[in-house]
Amino acid sequence: MWRKHKKEKMNSNLIIACPKGRLEKKVVKYLADRGLEMEKAFFDDEIRKLTFDTNFKNIKVIKLKPSDIRSYIILGAADIGFVGYDDILENSSENIVLLQKTSIGKCRISIASDRKKIDFSEKKVFKVATKFQNISEQYFRELNIQTETIKLNGSIELAVKYGVADFILDLVQSGQTLKDNQLYENVIINNDISTVIISSYYAYDTKKVFIKKLLTKGL
């Protein structure tokens, strides 16, 4: 049962950025396992508020789109946040401290096409549909394969079927979505993608004890 702690564990205030969507419940469980519980309103989809109290007076939780969490951390609006490791690989990690890798949302980054095997010698330039432009360009540059990146943000699996791209580079979890769209997983680029916990250097520097306690022993 959710209840307020009369005695605060630490003097510092802490703002935690929680991703909306499919990983939300797992992040909430992760925090609950460490002694942090959200107020009842957090679980009410009818309520539009995005900042929530917890059972510690000095800890607030904010709900954000996963793609926005990194910006909130860098700008100092949140102290710690949960993001995909793919976000760290795709974007500059400057001013970001990687605190902990979790097993939440474990998946991989793969190349997929409508062929069982891709022959990279059959074309001079391949079209790649992906939301991970930097990861894609770095990978193919290291292999000396010329590509044109088609930047998409959703329904990437359709790109091959409708001739937008020769293959896609995307996150794969079970592989069922690829199968449903008649695609084959050709190459696994990174098999170790999951949710990670990040902070800014400033927040970690000024609230290190508080943050470490939450992420290790619990509150």
Locate predicted features.
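Domain-level signature for soluble enzymes in the chorismate/prephenate branch of the shikimate pathway
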Residues: W2-L219
